[in-house]
Amino acid sequence: MDRLDRRLAATLLLFSFISFSTQKTSISWCVVSEAEEQKCLDLAGSATARNIRGTLLCVRGQSPTDCMEKIKNGTADAAAMFADDIYTAGWCFGLELAAGESYNGVDGISYYVVALARRSSSDLSLLEMHERSSCHPRIRTTVGWTVPIGFLVNTSQISVDEQCNFPKAVGDFFGYSCVPGVKDREHDPRGSNPKYLCEACIGDDNERHICVNNHRERHYGEAGALRCVAENLGDVAFVKHTTIFDNMDGNNMESWAMDLELEDLKLLCPDGSEAGPFDHETCHLAVVPANAVVVRPEDKCRVWKYLERLQNAFGNTTMFSSVGYTQSDLLFSDSTHHLLRVVGSYTSWLGPSYTTVLQAFECESLC
């Protein structure tokens, strides 16, 4: 019996050794630009120099969607993605999340999307926006398009035709708007998007480049949408909750911003009520979740443990900062304070309000 026990013990030990030795110890990170690839290679070199267990490899992808495909088929293991891409990765590719970015606010939350209006605007309600005028940072963005239009669809204020033509539905709904980029060839290849979606735009100082998808349009971006409302060219601006404070108290030296007072503004709430500019936690269209690391479901634990080792070794200096590179937000958002483990599903990370908004666009066939 002793010989049998020793043989059994030796067999179990050999099996354990083989199992351990065949475990995948490398993490292949999907990157989508030359600058991101360089930061990935630099981080990999630093990790090797620190003798951190595991190996970081860098795999070049063409786009977030290409990275999703690579992660699904095993040619890459992980990539950090925005909220819209997380939904696509989970819904279309069956992927999950290993870690999420945390900023200086509440864990898992990136920002709130709010509807901002002048306090002097009376009889204004988010439940009765038909023929009102609207200001959007730009076309096809979370803040400027996905969240506000999704809200209008989900509250049955807008209905989309069989062709899933959202620009037409939005143009028919609002009296006039400024949606920079809506007439660009990329977003309007047939030239059929309604002209009303550009009528609150003003272009540059020479009144050229009206409604273009860049800063030559003075109503472009978060500050531009706020300016659109401040100058009384729009009834409501759809912006991040931080936009007001980013453009006041000397943070924006343009004349329109210098003349703006906090008491001049209010938030419009989803239930039709109003609130003050500081009340974004209770008066918002959606909570947009922070970026997160997309992986195959079976790799949630393995990828998290490697990221945890990197984080413990480097903190937020080497891992999160993109200083010294030609782009920002490489591998992770520059504003990331730390990574936290995602134990639940991708839908729990996205949250109910944001997931509901995205479901309004299912006719666009994400998959």
Swiss-Prot record:
Going by the UniProt record, its keywords in alphabetical order are:
Secreted, Signal
Name the Gene3D superfamilies for this protein: Periplasmic binding protein-like II (3.40.190.10)
List the InterPro entries hit by this protein, alphabetically. Answer: Transferrin-like_dom
Gene Ontology biological-process annotations? iron ion transport
**One Gene Ontology cellular component annotation held by this UniProt entry:** extracellular space
Q: Which residues form the Transferrin-like domain?
A: 27-363
- Cellular compartments annotated: Secreted
Q: Which region is the signal sequence?
A: 1-23
UniProt subunit comment: Interacts with OTOL1.
The record's function comment reads: Required for normal otolith growth and deposition of otolin-1 in the otolith.
Question: What name does UniProt use for this protein?
Answer: Otolith matrix protein 1
UniProt source species:
Oncorhynchus mykiss (Rainbow trout)
Q: What is the lineage of its organism?
A: Eukaryota, Metazoa, Chordata, Craniata, Vertebrata
